[in-house]
Amino acid sequence: TGIPGLRVGYVAASENAHPYLVRLKQSTDLHTNRVGQWWCARFVNSPSYPAHLERLRAFYRERRDAMQAALTHHLGDLAEWIMPNGGLFFWVRLKNGGDTRALLVRALERKVAFMPGEAFFANADARYGAFMRLNFSHATPKQLEHGMAVLAEVIREHRSPVGAENAAGMVAI
């Protein structure tokens, strides 16, 4: 919430787990930057921190709400999701299943990116292929609207049988 890329946090753990967690932390980055920790402690305890958090909430709420509206408008018949109360992502599941990795290739060709959801599950199972994670933190509301329109087109094209005419009378190849 203050310095992008700075990761400061804490873990509450049993006394037995502590030495393992210390080794895990040390094996990843040795230690967190002390100046960063000092700055973070000062900032989160400052009188301006609550106002800063409210600005961030308003900023991301606008984008979340824009994505919710765009999803409803463009993907309401194709997918299901729950609007997040926190975080920066929507988890979307295609109603008729599918392979979001294959969709990603087509979406990237049209300059739209998302993360196939399968990578976030502990075991690779075909039923997880219908999930995707959509990030709303970087795009403007206008970009989100455009991105969801393109994504809906890509999903519909992907579902059209090869060589069959689609609703516009065009042949899918």
Each predicted region: which residue ranges?
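Conserved core segment of the aminotransferase class I/II
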Residues: 1-58
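Short, flexible turn/loop "capping" segments at secondary-structure junctions
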Residues: 2, 82-84, 125-128
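Short beta-strand segments
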Residues: 10-12, 83, 89-93, 116, ...
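Conserved C-terminal alpha-helix-loop-beta "cap" of PLP-dependent enzymes
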Residues: 17-18, 92-133, 141, 145-146
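Conserved glycine-rich beta-strand-loop-beta hairpin in the small C-terminal domain of fold type I
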Residues: 41, 54, 58-68, 79-93, ...
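Surface-exposed helix-capping loop/turn segments at secondary-structure junctions
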Residues: 51, 71-81, 159-163
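PLP-dependent enzyme catalytic core of the Aspartate aminotransferase-like
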Residues: 109, 125-173
